[in-house]
Regions:
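NAD(P)+-binding Rossmann beta1-loop-alpha1 motif at the extreme N-terminus of oxidoreductases
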Residues: 3, 8-77, 102, 139-142, ...
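Helical "substrate-binding/catalytic lid" subdomain
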Residues: 145, 149, 159, 171-317, ...
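Phosphate/pyrophosphate-binding betaalpha-module
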Residues: 155-169
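Rossmann-fold NAD(P)-binding glycine/threonine-rich loop
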Residues: 101-104, 108-157
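Hydrophobic beta-strand scaffold residues
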Residues: 41, 61, 129-130, 314
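Beta-loop-alpha module in the N-terminal Rossmann-like domain of NAD(P)-dependent dehydrogenases
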Residues: 66, 78-94, 112-115
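Short, well-ordered coil/turn residues at beta-beta hairpins
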Residues: 81-82, 108, 166
Length: 353
């Protein structure tokens, strides 16, 4: 395949070749978005069916990393989209083994930025450039585009600019900030070269930490609204239960799907996360199919660690992370200790739930 190569940054019109390793929901949709813009994709996945499906849509399929590399013209670029951790570690090593000096690897998953620094040094010994790219957009990215936070050497990032430009949402995804005139910058188009290796995933890490806090705020607010009718329930006052002094203040049976809808329009708390909350509540107002067990994928923990290392207070983000731990029953034994202490010092028996 002989395609025009990028000779300058910030051009969305230059077509490129790109190998993509990992064809899950995000990897496959990113390939589709790039193909829509005319880029040529060579796809590989450990699942041959995923490769066949994308090949049927116009991608070049590969049954091995060696075949993928052979179908790409030098200098090659390979985008890895696999789960963070050991799988990424193994995949980076395997991809580097089939590349040559001057080629580039992009890790578009949610890797720890410290791992990026180490991996960049390792593959750099082979003359291979390493780019870390924090990717936000999820399953909606095919149509909406992906917000890209990029770290790595200038030469590699500039060469990959047409890929980033095609994946990003574009300037029309949001109103331009007052005072920004002239041609839109890459950041206004939805992608940013944040700095050297690790910077992209560092920014994405904090992005996800903020996401935890925003989600927790919506959840807590909705819980207050859900219980605004507590005054209708008789609460016995005894030594073990604080009385509700004014039950008349809590007589509201609020329609939470409707509250979410009204907040979406003109409210200062409007956001895409609120849009998704409204959609979930429209489908199931009581969310009965959910247990409330909330996972954390690592970025919230890494954000808290960075805040501690920097000496920066982050009570909201850290509490939101701890609430996720609590949702998984990890606070249950601590609660038993509290109950046991009350029994010891005051003879307080537990009340039935």
């Amino acid at each position: 395949m002989a395609l025009q190569r990028a000779t300058h940054p910030y051009s969305a019109e230059v077509l490129m070749e790109l190998g993509i390793v990992g064809l899950g929901r995000m990897g496959a949709n990113m390939a589709r978005r790039l193909m829509r813009d005319g880029h040529e994709i060579v796809a590989y996945d450990v699942n041959p069916e995923a490769v066949s499906q994308l090949a049927g849509e116009g991608a070049g399929g590969a049954s091995s990393l060696e075949e993928m590399a052979s179908k790409l013209s030098a200098p090659r670029s390979v985008w890895i989209m696999v789960p963070a951790g050991e799988i990424t570690e193994q995949t980076v090593d395997a991809v580097a083994a089939v590349l040559e000096p001057g080629d580039a690897i992009v890790d578009g998953g949610n890797s720890y930025y410290r791992d990026d620094i180490r991996r960049a040094a390792k593959v750099g010994e082979q003359g291979i450039d390493y780019v870390d790219c924090g990717t936000s957009g999820g399953v909606f990215g095919l149509e909406r585009g992906y917000c890209l936070m990029i770290g790595g050497p200038d030469r590699a990032v500039e060469r990959l600019d047409p890929i980033f430009a095609s994946l990003a949402p574009g300037v029309d995804a949001a109103e331009r900030t007052p005072g920004r005139d002239g041609d839109p910058s890459p950041s206004e188009n939805g992608y940013l070269h944040c700095g050297p290796n690790g910077a992209g995933h560092f920014v994405k890490m904090v992005h996800n930490g903020i996401e935890y806090g925003i989600m927790a705020a919506y959840a807590e607010g909705m819980n207050i609204l859900k219980n605004a009718n507590v005054g209708k329930v008789k609460r016995e006052a005894d030594a073990e239960t604080a009385p509700l002094d004014h039950p008349e203040y809590y007589q509201y049976d609020l329609d939470l799907p409707e509250v979410a809808e009204v907040w979406r329009r003109g409210s200062v708390v409007g956001s895409w996360l609120l849009d998704l909350t409204a959609a979930a509540m429209q489908e199931s107002p009581d969310l009965a199919e959910f247990t409330g067990r909330v996972s954390d994928s690592g970025e919230g923990r890494w954000t808290a660690i960075a805040a501690i290392d920097e000496g920066v207070p982050t009570p909201v983000l850290t509490t939101a992370l701890h609430e996720r731990f609590y949702s998984r029953g990890l606070g249950d034994f601590g609660d038993k200790v509290l109950s046991a202490m009350r029994k010891q010092f005051g003879g307080h028996d537990e009340k039935a739930s």
